[in-house]
Amino acid sequence: MWEEINMIKIYTLGGYEEVGKNMTAVEYNGEVVIVDMGIRLDRVLIHEDVEFQKMSSKDLRKLGAIPDDRPIRNKKVVAIALSHGHLDHIGAVGKLAPHYPDVPIYGTPYTIRLAKSEIKGEEYFEVTNPLYETNYGEIVQVSENLAIEFVQITHSIPQSSIVVIHTPEGAVVYACDYKFDNNHPYGERPDYKRLKELGKEGVKVLIAESTRVAEETKTPSEAVAKMLLEDFFLYEGMEADGLIATTFASHIARLQELIEIANKMGRQAIFIGRSLAKYTGIAKQLGLIKMKGSRVLRSPNAVSKVLKEVSQARENYLLIVTGHQGEPGAILTRMANGELYDIGPRDTVVFSAGVIPNPLNVAQRYALETKLRMKGVRMIKNLHVSGHASKEDHRYLIRMLNPEYIVPAHGEFRMLTHYAELAEEEGYMIGKEVFISRNGHVVEIPGSLEG
């Protein structure tokens, strides 16, 4: 009698009903590799009295702020792999890694150092897991049957990876988050050669983000964002006194562009905000950003002192601040509330970031813009390109890898279904080769047959 063995199980623990709290686990022959441990930030921000670092994983799970990892809690976990350094992928490491004490955590150098920063701030759990910086192209054997590999890809944070879990049944490829940037201003490139090799070697399952798959285009290069910024800041008609730019603190390429623009304008770039200090500090350690001519303000005293100087000679500075989503406590939000700096008609605020599409962010950004408008501030919006793959990026990845099965991830249900529709266009059948899952469910992938 024939029976199916060597089944691969995909535990879809977080990020399969929302954009956030990403966590997936891959089981083969009783051994598990976890990929990502993220948070859902809006579920933390919506409660004013929540102190994330001091809370238990149980309480945060009830808030819907971190993934529910109970389906794999008693499994034999052999490794934790982190795809990149965004908080919706690493923000819960301090809360969830302690459930798997001493299990090694792997990622690229920038990702691991950001994870260490998160762990350092953890106040509820002690984290004993060793963390290892892994280079692109290195294949790490984590058990007799399983190995992991980080393949270079482009996204809106340095050293992002497509994570590959090698099994005797073929590769499980985790592509959350990515885009194909062929003209990155600072030389980052997708490793097309390795992706094509994987396709030839045999990809069993592709787990792919679906955030922007409904957009019928290819996501533009970061070079386009650089051009948009230069086109605004460096044209002859620029008459602004005070210039304030805001973008994602982790978007190191964008921050580098702003430093270079400030230098060309004869202005000093000044970074203000704790998260900007953290991300640029670690990037500088690794040689990922050149801070020439700029300053980073860390202490509240330095911020208030320097902003007094800036207000007397606004034309000499480009302020780069936190707060593009209108987050409470961020620098731009505080300025709009009349704190720190007398922002007004002499100032121009440049938003080099889109609005994250959840109701809390939309509401907070609306409140921020309204306050700035009431103060007479000029606003320039959408000098930005996304870091997420659009439909044609996804189509190319499917064709390169030629996976047997596809599990859409990293999105609300409607996003996952849009990905499934693309897979159908590429010849896959929903329910047979494409599986739409939910948080807490398991997708069972048939293994080889032996008698």
From Swiss-Prot:
GO terms for biological process: RNA catabolic process. This is Ribonuclease J. Its EC number is 3.1.-.-. Binds 2 Zn(2+) ions per subunit. It is not clear if Zn(2+) or Mg(2+) is physiologically important. Inhibited by 1,10-phenanthroline. Zn(2+) 1 binds at H84, H86, H155, D177. The gene is rnj. Changing H86A: 5% exoribonuclease activity.
